[in-house]
């Protein structure tokens, strides 16, 4: 199947390189657009009772550091049809919205072989809602 627009769910971790390389290979083969998608789920808001005066500054600093890492990853991709989307929202809803807006016909995401992921894989909630093909790349935990 020929893909026109490939979405890649990235987290800002080292494993992103594996996902991006797989997606980039497919994008080059299909002359497709490549969109890296990062969802900032605002996990820091889960603990609203924990607060100290510098909380906002620290959270902003961490977000900037994370975003810079993602921008650097995107900049290093040697493919002119590449872009990065960083959105605030919840998984999988926000990811599905972006996939639809971008008209992606393939989603590339990763999977850790851990006990918790066997019980509750992140992609389980989107399989029945996703209108694109799904490529799940296994991560080998060390």
UniProtKB/Swiss-Prot annotation:
The keyword Cytoplasm applies. Its main location: cytoplasm. Transmembrane segments: none annotated. It is found in: Cytoplasm. GO terms for cellular component: cytoplasm. Keywords: Cytoplasm. Gene3D superfamilies: HUPs (3.40.50.620). InterPro entries: Rossmann-like_a/b/a_fold, Universal_stress_UspA, UspA. Belongs to the universal stress protein A family. Required for resistance to DNA-damaging agents. This is Universal stress protein D. The lineage of its organism: Bacteria, Pseudomonadati, Pseudomonadota, Gammaproteobacteria, Enterobacterales. The gene is uspD.
